[in-house]
A protein has these predicted regions:
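Helix-turn-helix DNA-binding segment
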Residues: 155-189
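Acidic, metal-coordinating helix/loop segments flanking the phosphotransfer/catalytic sites
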Residues: 42-65
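Conserved phosphotransfer cores of two-component systems
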Residues: 56-60, 89-96, 117-118
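Short, flexible helix-to-coil linker/hinge segments that flank and couple to helix-turn-helix
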Residues: 112-116, 120-122, 128-164
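Active-site residues of response regulator receiver
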Residues: 64, 68-71, 75-76
Length: 189
């Protein structure tokens, strides 16, 4: 039983040639070491170029995998401020595409925003990854998503542990409200 290789139409969007090369090399390594994965790779260094390339894809020729740098220069003509705007458009027009966000932003607020808006199948902070990690990350995104790099996971953990932290008093207030206690009666408790 010979399995036919699955070819992924892949778009790498980053304004740094070295990063594009790293992604390309990781994909070529995967294609060489697995028999069932192949990649047709296109590159874009700006929102405008990416937008132009994305127009080539349709239901018969799908865009399957996208590497998206968030810190892309703005595109006034498209009304895009960063790669995040481009990510929203990819989600809308190519819902089947697996998006791997790669960024240097590592603050919790930006990471949460990207999750909320794009919800990528892969999310890596560039300083977290080397060639080996990148290959492993891509395999996971393709075969068993999601993949999040260490800093992203730490931000998620921090968000979860901070967002729902209720002390005894908070729980008591919620209980009283659920029992029909009026807001104006709360100070008397």
């Amino acid at each position: 039983l010979i399995m036919e290789a699955k070819e992924y139409n892949t778009l790498i969007i980053d304004d740094h040639p070295l990063i594009i090369e790293a992604f390309r090399n990781a994909l070529l390594h995967i294609a060489k070491t697995t028999e069932e994965l192949e990649f047709s790779i296109t590159e874009a260094t700006s929102c405008d170029t990416a937008q132009h390339i994305m127009e080539r894809y349709n239901p018969h020729k799908t865009l399957d995998l996208v590497f998206l740098d968030i810190k892309l220069p703005p595109s006034p003509t498209l009304g895009m401020l960063s790669g995040e705007d481009l990510g929203l458009e990819i989600r809308e027009k190519h819902p089947q595409a697996k998006i791997v966000v790669a960024t240097t932003f590592n603050d919790n607020y930006r990471i949460q925003n990207i999750f909320r808006n794009i919800n990528p199948e892969g999310f890596v902070i560039k300083s977290d990854i080397d060639t080996e990690t990148l290959v492993a990350a891509l395999m996971e995104v393709l075969l068993d998503p999601p993949y999040y790099s260490k800093t992203v996971l730490q931000a998620i953990r921090k968000y979860i542990s901070h967002d729902y932290l209720l002390d005894k008093w908070d729980r008591h207030l919620l209980y009283e409200l659920s029992q029909g206690t009026k807001m104006k009666e709360l100070p008397d408790l």
